[in-house]
């Protein structure tokens, strides 16, 4: 009886360990993504999940909000920033969880949505305008640079509504709460492009927060990101390739 009991316990222990290892292997890839790129990355991830069987979980907010979450220990495997500096800051900070160099994944384009399509609308104070919060969102920061141009000084008394991120800014405009919005092209493909020389380039960088040696799914995902197929999906979404 004692032998049978010991054997039964050994089998239970072996089964428990196997199940534990199985659950470890089945953990989803956890990704933090800037709001402007969320929908594009969701489409990319849908194909990755279908072809590999690996699950991906997205958390989306403005770049500044996500940076604060990561700095305070939020458990992400990779971070897609809407700018270059934030990703580089994580990659170079010895106290951060970054596990590799930051890399460019897309170049953003700022557009003016609404009205008659003329950029001169920005000079009219009667036109209310939505932008993302420039303190936490790179597209909002770029928008403020554009609004600071001399030819738009007459519009400085306009109603300016700041969304927590570009998605909320888009919603302000789309629902009619504002007349105009300065947005990423990916959210309003038919809107009027802002000349690139009017603001610093919106270079969107990502950085891995887990080591690929410990996370084989992340290694496979990073390879997938560099494929021509994914690059084509990013371009189709309204972004430009990295220079």
PLM feature segments, named:
Residues 1-11:
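Bacterial N-terminal signal peptides that target proteins for export
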């Amino acid at each position: 009886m004692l032998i049978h009991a010991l054997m039964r316990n050994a089998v239970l222990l072996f089964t428990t360990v196997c199940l534990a290892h199985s659950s470890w292997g089945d953990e989803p890839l956890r990704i933090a993504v800037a709001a402007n790129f969320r929908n594009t990355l969701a489409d990319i991830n849908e194909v990755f999940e279908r072809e590999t069987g690996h699950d991906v979980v997205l958390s989306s907010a403005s770049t500044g909000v996500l940076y604060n979450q990561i700095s305070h220990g939020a458990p992400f495997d990779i971070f897609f920033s809407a700018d270059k500096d934030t990703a580089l800051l994580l990659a170079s900070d010895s106290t951060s969880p970054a596990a590799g160099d930051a890399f460019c994944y897309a170049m953003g384009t700022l557009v003016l949505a609404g009205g008659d399509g003329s950029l001169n609308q920005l000079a009219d104070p009667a036109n209310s305008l939505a932008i993302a919060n420039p303190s936490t969102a790179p597209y909002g920061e770029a928008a403020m640079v554009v609004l600071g141009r001399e030819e738009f000084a007459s519009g400085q008394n306009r109603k300016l509504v700041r969304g927590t991120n570009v998605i909320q800014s888009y919603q302000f405009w789309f629902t009619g709460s504002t007349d105009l919005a300065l947005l990423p092209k990916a959210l309003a493909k038919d809107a009027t492009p802002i000349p690139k020389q009017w603001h610093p380039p919106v270079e969107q960088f990502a950085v891995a927060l887990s080591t690929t040696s410990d996370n084989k799914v992340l290694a496979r995902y990073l390879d997938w990101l560099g494929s021509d197929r994914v690059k084509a999906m990013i371009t189709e979404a309204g972004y430009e390739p990295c220079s």
